[in-house]
């Protein structure tokens, strides 16, 4: 898994070179969120207008042996997409989450 992240960054870079205004979505599993830090730091430097991070953990990310949640990196996300995702993530957490469930919605690059 971790070896795939540099390839994902390169693929997004290539996509943005060909289509700078294009929207791209990358799904990723979350076993332990701390393993994603380098990927997200690198992604935040991409030459995109906006970068939106949406994550749902159905349980705490304290075990690398199971899928604890998943995330989406949205490159050049549609306008006000965060306002659509916020209630959806809260609803999913309420219906699917176990004790310690959480969600995160964060602009790595906010709209200007």
Q: Which residues does each predicted region cover?
A:
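Class I S-adenosyl-L-methionine-dependent methyltransferase catalytic core
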Residues: 1-112
